[in-house]
Amino acid sequence: MNASVKHPHTIKDEFELIQSATDYYLQRDEKWWISGRFFQHELISIFQPVFSISQGQTMGRAAYIRAKADGEIVLWPWQIFSLASKDEQLVELDRLCRAIHASNYYFNHPYPSDNLFVEVHPRLLESVKDDHGQAFENFLDLIGVRTSRVVIEIPVTVNRNWKLLRHVIANYRSRGYLIAANYSIGCSDWMIKLGSLYPNIVRITANDLIQQEDIPSLVDSIHNAGASLLVREIETSIQFATALKANADYLQGNLLGQPEQAITTRDLLHRV
């Protein structure tokens, strides 16, 4: 066993600490995986590897929420969040999901130095005026994880509101989080618009990358801004080859690794 893997008694102690210090409805199974409850649904984490081309292995994993019943997935993220019709319910659900993700990732991950990628709901960004990420930072402090180990994925819909996008990036960055923004196809000057608030990572789908007329110029503009390029939703060998040829930094997609409720190895990119 890797020396960085936490022993069951350590996880138990930390889980009890979380229960005593928060009002999250959490539970753990016999394998020490933590789940939560929202509107009678059991919420679980699944993780998809994000690969670093230069390292040839995972540099992190993207976390997604699912609702499970009788061992089967019954609700997908958009269905789960649709249950939160009120802003206060949305805030509660979002914080619960992040707590579940962070607990599972850092309690069960054999390589705790890898980054955790977490999504943020666009409605949450609009309903929380300031101090984005403060509640999550408090939870990370509780379990002993630095915010610099977490990548906040800003939803692509926020690109339509530049004022909000700049405000959100500044908020999260001030707390030490890494920021991943999505490239907007057809908006070539968006990096310039962000001014000095360049994200750490720019995400683009494999399909959108292939559709670019001048891929080298796009990639150069991202790298010149000091950001790394992550190509996601890689499903085919052609998309994979295009991402490699484009000089992308990070890769993610079902071709490389399916989302699953397990973190067992530091996957190697050359297995593809």
Task: Describe the role of every protein-language-model region.
Residues 69, 118, 183, 243:
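Signature for phosphate-centric chemistry
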Residues 94-162:
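Catalytic core of bacterial c-di-GMP phosphodiesterases, primarily the EAL and HD-GYP domains
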Residues 168-182, 218-231:
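Short beta-strand/loop segments at the ligand-binding rim of alpha/beta enzyme cores
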